[in-house]
Amino acid sequence: MSQPVYSLKQLADFLNVEFQGNGATLLSGVEEIGEAKAAHVTFLDNEKYAKHLKSSEAGAIILSRTQFQKYRELNKNFLIVSESPSLVFQKCLELFIAPVDSGFPGIHPTAVIHPTAIIEEHVCIEPYVVICQHARIGAACHIGTGSVIGAHSSIGEHSYIYPRVVVRERVSIGKRVIIQPGAIIGSCGFGYVTSAFGQHKHLKHLGTVIIEDDVEIGANTTIDRGRFKHSIVREGSKIDNLVQIAHQVEVGQHSMVVAQAGIAGSTKIGNHVIIGGQAGVTGHICIADHVIMMAQTGVTKSITSPGIYGGAPARPYQEVHRQVAKIRNLPRLEERIASLEKLVQKLEALSEQH
C-alpha cells in the first residue's frame, strides 16, 4: 500500500482552509507536535504544547485563526482553521492512514443466523457470529468476529459492532452506534433480596436496554438491563472502556462517562454531563444537566446544579480546592501550634514564679 503524498497547497485545498508558507512542501504523514519532522502534519490545540512551536520541524502545523495571529511571526508552514484544530487534524489522520478492514466481506459461512432473523442490505457479518431468532440487523451494519446478537434485538443501520461483543435479548441499538470489543449490553442487573436467614435470592431482570443513535461504547464496558423497565443511553453519549452502568440507569444526551466509572441502579444522569475516570455514582439519585465530575469523585446524593464537582462525598470544586489547600498547610500549622504551646508553657512558668 503506497503512502499518499500531498503538497501544502493541495492539503489546504482539500481541507478548504487557508495556509501560510511554502505551498510546494510535500507532506506524507502525521505526528505529535514535539516529534514531527519535515514530511509531517501536526496541530496545536492545547496551548501548553505551544512551547514546541518554535523548534518544531513539522512540514505543516494546523492552528486556529486566533493562534495564527499570535504565532505568525515564526514563519512556519501553517494551516489556518476556523473550527477545532484537533477536528481538522483528524481529517488529515484519515487521509494519511488508510483504514484496514478484516478481509471478510459479506456474510461469512461460519456465521450462525437464525432463519427468522432479518438481515438488511450491505451488511458485513464476520466469522463465528451468532444472530438469534427475530433479531434485526440494519443496513450497512458490521458485526465483528464472535459477537452474539440476542433474540428480538435490533441493530440500527450503519452501526459497527467489534469482535466478541454480546448484545443480549430484546436490546435496541440505534443508528451509527459503535461498540468496542468485549462490551456486554443487556446482562442481568445486580439485584437481590436477602432472606431472614441471610440468603441472597437473585431477582430476574426482565427489562431491557435502549442505546440511542450515535452512541459509542468502549471495550469491556457492561450495561445491565432493567429489572422491569429500561436502562437507557441517550443520543450522542460516549462511554469509555471498563465502565459499569447498572440496571435502570438513564444516561442523558451527549454525556461522557470516562474509564472505570460506575453508576449504580436507577440513577438518572442529565444531558451534557461528564463523569471522570474511576468516579462512583450511588443509586436512586439524579444528576443535573451540565455537571462535570472530576476523577475519583464519589457521588452519594443528587446534584441539582450545574458545575464542577470533586471529592468524596462530592462537593463543588471550589470547596474541594480550598480543603486541599488547607490540608497542604497542616504541617505548617502544626509547627505554629507547637511553637505556641512552647510559648504558653514559658508564660505559665513565668506566671508561677511571680
From Swiss-Prot:
An annotated Gene Ontology molecular function: N-acyltransferase activity
Record flagged with keyword Flavoprotein: no
One of the record's GO cellular component terms: membrane
Alphabetical UniProt keywords: Acyltransferase, Lipid A biosynthesis, Lipid biosynthesis, Lipid metabolism, Repeat, Transferase
Record Gene3D superfamilies: 1.20.5.170, Hexapeptide repeat proteins (2.160.10.10), MurE/MurF, N-terminal domain (3.40.1390.10)
Enzymatic reactions: a UDP-3-O-[(3R)-3-hydroxyacyl]-alpha-D-glucosamine + a (3R)-hydroxyacyl-[ACP] = a UDP-2-N,3-O-bis[(3R)-3-hydroxyacyl]-alpha-D-glucosamine + holo-[ACP] + H(+)
EC code: 2.3.1.191
GO biological process: lipid A biosynthetic process
Iron as UniProt keyword: no
Pfam families: Hexapep, LpxD
Pathway this chain belongs to: Bacterial outer membrane biogenesis; LPS lipid A biosynthesis
Catalytic-site annotation from UniProt: 247
Subunit details: Homotrimer.
Its job: Catalyzes the N-acylation of UDP-3-O-acylglucosamine using 3-hydroxyacyl-ACP as the acyl donor. Is involved in the biosynthesis of lipid A, a phosphorylated glycolipid that anchors the lipopolysaccharide to the outer membrane of the cell.
Family, per entry: Belongs to the transferase hexapeptide repeat family. LpxD subfamily.
Protein name, as recorded: UDP-3-O-acylglucosamine N-acyltransferase
